[in-house]
Every structure is written in structure tokens, then in C-alpha cells.
């Protein structure tokens, strides 16, 4: 058993370390001043073989990534997996990981004094639309935990903006179901995160599909919150997301 555990550690750790090193060394530090509010973010440019305009990929981190250092957000589960998927599939893309400030959350639903930061993310997206000529039919939104909830709220507040989305372990509390119909969305929860969350997402997914939307949901067997947010970003799910193009 000790030999098996050692072998498992050897096999898993290099993969995790390489993803972490890639995200820290490949994503350039950037910031944008928006009428007194500084939006800090990291950005990677992925150059595929195609000459087509780049897709824009936005990742929203979880609660532990909040701050002002423009680094804590890079610990977000899934960043490395998304980046490596884009690279290995030769997808021209700008991948942006904004940092939510300490006093905010993406959706504004984390506490009584909480301030939503998604409007600034939308303005960051608009900046790249006007300044870089990205492919506006291929803007993708992904996030985990607090960022998963942020995904749902951005789909709610800005329908028609995104080609597709993936929300890992984040709920859609307070969202207007009709607004969510515009965007194909894949969501996940771990089974150890609770039946209430899973049942709510099953109900929402069924409603969206019944009313002309496109939604998928998977309950990840035996996984707790931290495990589920890491396991959500598989190649198969990312393939589903990036196969979509806004009509």
C-alpha cells in the first residue's frame, strides 16, 4: 500500500506542479483603471495554427482568490486545465483571469455588505472587444465555487454575450431563468456538496432544456467541494463548451 501511495504521488504531483508553474509564468500581470476602480487580472495569449480571430476566455475564481495582489486568483481550480486544453487543441485565444477585490464578490450574494464585481468584468470584456478585435461569437465564461455563482449571474445580467459557459459548484440563486435561456451552460456539483444544491441544479437544468435552452448538469460521485471544483474541468466538458459559437 505504501508503494502504491508513493507511486500515485509521483504520477499526480508533476501534473499539478506543471499546471501551477504554467499559470504563474505564462499569464501576464495586467490592470485596467475604470473611472477610479482598478481591475487587476492575468492574461495569457494562446496562438493556435488558425489565422481566425482569437476567442476570449474568462475564468472567475473562488472566494480564496480575492485580494489586490493579482496573484491569489491564480490558485483557482481549473485554470491550468483550461489553458492546456486551449494549447493542445490549437485554439487561438486570449484567456483572462480577473481578481475580485477583497470587499467584493462576483455576484454580490456573499454577505450583507457585499458589492458585485461582475459589472467590471463586463467592462473588461467590452474593452477587449473594442481594442483587440476578438471573435465576438466565441466569448466563453467559466468559474468555480464563488466563481461558479458568478458565471450564473453574468449569464443572467448579460444575456447574449457568451457563446457557452461552465459553472462548477456554484448556484444560480436569484437569477431569472428566462435570461439564462440565451447561453448554453454546463454545470457540476460534487455529490458530497449536498442534495439541496444538486436537486436545485437538476430542476434548473430540466427547466432550461424544456423551454428551449441548452443545459447539462453532472453530479460528480463522492466528491466534496474542493475536489469537485478541481474535477469539473475535464477535456470532455471543455470540448463541449468550446464547440459552441454564438449565433
What are these regions (language model features)?
Residues 184-247:
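C-terminal catalytic histidine-bearing segment of alpha/beta-hydrolase fold enzymes
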Residues 130-131, 137-181:
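Primarily recognizes the serine-hydrolase "nucleophile elbow" in alpha/beta-hydrolase
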Residues 47-52, 104-145:
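Gly/Ser-rich "nucleophile elbow"/oxyanion-hole loop immediately N-terminal to the catalytic nucleophile
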Residues 17-56, 93, 122, 142, ...:
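A domain-start/cap signature at the N-terminus of enzymes
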Residues 56, 63-118:
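Active-site machinery of serine-nucleophile hydrolases
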Residues 60-62, 189:
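The conserved beta1-alpha1 loop
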Residues 1-23:
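Bacterial Sec-dependent N-terminal signal peptides
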Residues 58-60, 168, 220:
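Alpha/beta-hydrolase
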Amino acid at each position: 500500500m505504501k508503494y502504491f501511495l508513493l507511486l500515485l504521488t509521483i504520477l499526480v504531483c508533476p501534473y499539478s506542479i506543471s499546471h501551477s508553474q504554467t499559470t504563474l509564468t505564462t499569464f501576464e500581470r495586467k490592470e485596467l483603471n475604470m473611472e477610479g476602480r482598478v481591475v487587476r487580472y492575468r492574461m495569457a495569449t494562446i496562438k493556435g495554427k488558425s489565422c481566425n480571430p482569437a476567442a476570449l476566455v474568462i475564468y472567475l475564481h473562488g472566494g480564496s482568490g480575492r485580494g489586490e495582489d493579482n496573484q491569489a486568483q491564480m490558485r483557482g481550480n481549473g485554470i491550468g486545465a483550461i489553458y492546456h486544453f486551449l494549447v493542445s487543441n490549437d485554439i487561438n485565444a486570449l484567456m483572462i483571469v480577473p481578481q475580485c477585490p477583497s470587499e467584493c464578490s462576483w455576484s454580490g450574494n456573499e454577505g450583507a455588505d457585499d458589492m458585485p464585481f461582475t459589472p467590471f468584468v463586463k467592462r473588461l470584456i467590452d474593452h477587449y472587444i473594442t481594442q483587440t478585435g476578438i471573435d465576438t461569437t466565441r466569448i466563453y465564461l467559466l468559474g468555480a465555487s464563488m466563481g461558479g455563482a458568478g458565471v450564473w449571474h453574468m449569464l443572467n445580467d448579460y444575456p447574449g454575450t457568451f457563446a457557452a459557459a461552465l459553472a462548477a459548484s456554484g448556484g444560480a440563486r436569484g437569477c431569472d431563468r428566462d435570461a439564462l435561456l440565451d447561453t448554453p451552460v454546463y454545470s457540476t456539483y460534487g455529490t458530497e456538496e449536498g442534495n439541496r444544491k444538486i436537486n436545485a441544479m437538476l430542476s434548473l437544468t430540466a427547466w432550461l432544456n424544456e423551454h428551449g435552452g441548452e443545459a447539462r448538469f453532472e453530479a460528480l460521485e463522492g466528491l466534496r467541494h474542493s475536489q469537485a471544483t478541481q474535477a469539473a474541468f475535464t477535456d470532455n466538458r471543455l470540448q463541449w463548451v468550446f464547440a459552441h459559437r454564438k449565433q
